[in-house]
Amino acid sequence: MLIVLAGCGGGGSPASPFGTTITITSAGVSPTQVTVSPGTRVTFVNNDSRSHNMTSDPHPEHNDCPEINTVGLLQPGQSHKTGNLVTIRTCGFHDHDDPPPPGGNKWTGKITIR
């Protein structure tokens, strides 16, 4: 006897268990918001012509999500990964060398772990 099981997915995009990439260009970060599964590492890629120093919010303490601080300084063409994001929460990030005003700027974003 052969039993086949099938399922339908719900709406929305599931969190990726394989990691996500955030790209930095002169226009800013893309995407500005990502959702990942616990234990995921996010890769930041600098495709801009200048360096960016990516850190966790808030500025200047950078202590909300220390796993983001492992990205650090990215020279043009470089990529670095966050540490394992294991705690379920939303983490803001920004370019430390171009700190955001209230409301953010083009080098800010959020990573949601769920």
State where each predicted segment sits:
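Short beta-strand and strand-turn-strand segments in soluble, beta-rich domains
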Residues: 62-68
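Acidic glycine-/aspartate-rich tracts in secreted/extracellular proteins
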Residues: 47-50, 58-62, 98-101
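Beta-strand-rich interaction surfaces with strong enrichment in secreted/lumenal proteins
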Residues: 32, 69-73
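N-terminal edge beta-strand
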Residues: 16-41
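Extracellular/periplasmic metallocenter environments
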Residues: 72-114
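Bacterial signal peptide processing site
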Residues: 9-11
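Beta-strand cores of secreted/periplasmic/IMS beta-sandwich domains, seen most often
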Residues: 32-55, 79-87, 91-92
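C-terminal motif of bacterial Sec signal peptides marking the signal peptidase cleavage site
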Residues: 4-7
